[in-house]
């Protein structure tokens, strides 16, 4: 199996997890808006997955940098920088006392991240299929060459 195929499979799985984590955060905020859960539970659930999301997105960005895939790296680098800046400024966690005031902004922020991750998902699926097809065609061509000898 090619390193590039492994990279795109890792990217596919990582982006699926990122979409799931962002959707989970959005569901927690919607439940809070409709008063299904209290602010403490909502903020503790969101805060428990924020660092996982940041670490996974940073690892994915670093893997694109290390494998010299410049376009995905340049697309993901500003988001990784923003996540790092939020973490360094200690603004990455949702505050229990401020969550109702920031509810609309937090939901918009998560929706934008969800749209961003979906666009990355489309790019990743395309690159995964192209890499798999190219790898399959190259192996098929090598197999035909060895049989003719």
Curated annotation (Swiss-Prot):
Cellular-component GO terms for this entry: endoplasmic reticulum membrane; Golgi membrane
Keyword Membrane: yes
Membrane topology note: Multi-pass membrane protein
Superkingdom: Eukaryota
Pfam families, sorted: Cornichon
Molecular function terms from GO: signaling receptor binding
A single GO BP: vesicle-mediated transport
Membrane-traversing stretches: 3-23, 59-79, 117-137
UniProt key word Transmembrane helix: yes
Subcellular location: Endoplasmic reticulum membrane; Golgi apparatus membrane
Keyword tags: Endoplasmic reticulum, Golgi apparatus, Membrane, Transmembrane, Transmembrane helix
Function per UniProt: Acts as a cargo receptor necessary for the transportation of secretory proteins from the endoplasmic reticulum (ER) in COPII-coated vesicles targeted to the Golgi apparatus.
UniProt record similarity statement: Belongs to the cornichon family.
Protein name per Swiss-Prot or TrEMBL: Protein cornichon homolog 2
Species in which this protein is naturally found: Oryza sativa subsp. japonica
Classification lineage: Eukaryota, Viridiplantae, Streptophyta, Embryophyta, Tracheophyta
Gene name per UniProt: CNIH2
């Amino acid at each position: 199996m090619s390193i590039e195929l492994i990279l795109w499979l890792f990217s596919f799985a990582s982006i699926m997890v990122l979409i799931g984590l962002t959707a989970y955060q959005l569901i927690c905020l919607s439940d809070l808006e409709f008063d299904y859960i209290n602010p403490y539970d909502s903020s503790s659930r969101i805060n428990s997955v924020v660092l996982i999301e940041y670490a996974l997105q940073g690892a994915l960005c670093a893997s694109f940098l290390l494998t010299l895939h410049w376009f995905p790296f340049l697309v993901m680098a500003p988001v990784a920088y923003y996540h790092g800046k939020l973490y360094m400024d200690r603004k990455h966690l949702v505050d229990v006392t401020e969550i109702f005031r920031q509810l609309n902004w937090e939901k918009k922020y998560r929706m934008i991240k969800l749209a961003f991750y979906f666009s990355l998902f489309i790019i990743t699926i395309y690159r995964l299929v192209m890499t798999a097809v190219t790898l399959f065609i190259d192996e098929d061509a090598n197999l035909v060459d060895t049989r003719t000898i």
